Amino acid sequence: MYKRQIITNAHKIIQGEHPDLSRKDSDCFFFQRLQEKDATQLMLDLVKTRLPNAYGYSPMEDIQVITPSRKGSMGVIELNQQLQAVLNPKSVDKPECRSILYTFREGDKVMQIKNNYDIIWHKDGENGTGIFNGDIGYLRAINRQGQEVIAEFDGRRATYPFEQLDQLELAYAVTVHKSQGSEFQAVVMPLLGGFPKLYYRNLLYTAVTRARRLLILIGSQNVIYQMVDNNRRMNRYTCLRDMLEQQKPTQTLPISQSDEPDGEIKDTQKQEESL
């Protein structure tokens, strides 16, 4: 019987237990790939061909690659360029424009990376303002003569002059941080050795819970287990609280009720045969 292992593994992770990566009857896959080139190639094959063929998912709309970091060979900048090359390849029929980081072309999947409260959008004869940090959409047109692009976010079309292209990034791959608050039918996450400070339990939990129907982890099982074991964020706040306790003055001073402190710091599968 098909098992909802995403939910089970999410509970395990947040409780500090290692997730079950071996089930063959679940919605959570793990592929061991210890070389970056092998992990990247599998990711590209899954997003472009294997998941669409097996589940009918749209590579653009349903599948999201999520990764811990921006930089490095497994970071969003590099992965976006590779995913763009296979999902929206260069063509004489597709106009392009350039930002500092990326070459954009018509049809690209993009993300707004800073709040823009003033930009005007149009949808079904209605007008409004505001495209916000984390919104994901698509480039519908690039007007090189007019030096502007049209991006569509959930039916809202907004025009960006070229000088505002720094507000957009390719979004075939996004960081875990940028994925917060969103859900996707399928999540593909490469996890190999990278930046140790970024590999911790809450980050893995956040990534896993972005997946509605299907989660695929690619890389090293040891890295995944190390993330679960690394409760760095919780420890950071615990250490801060202990440090503040130690620095409390020994002399008791009279204070008014309005001056009282709040008192507590709060921290707001190996299944390749079926794919």
Task: Pin down the residues of each PLM region.
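C-terminal accessory regions
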Residues: 133-275
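Intrinsically disordered, low-complexity sequence elements enriched in Ser/Thr/Gly/Pro
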Residues: 2, 31, 230-234
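Conserved helicase motor core of P-loop NTPases
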Residues: 3-130
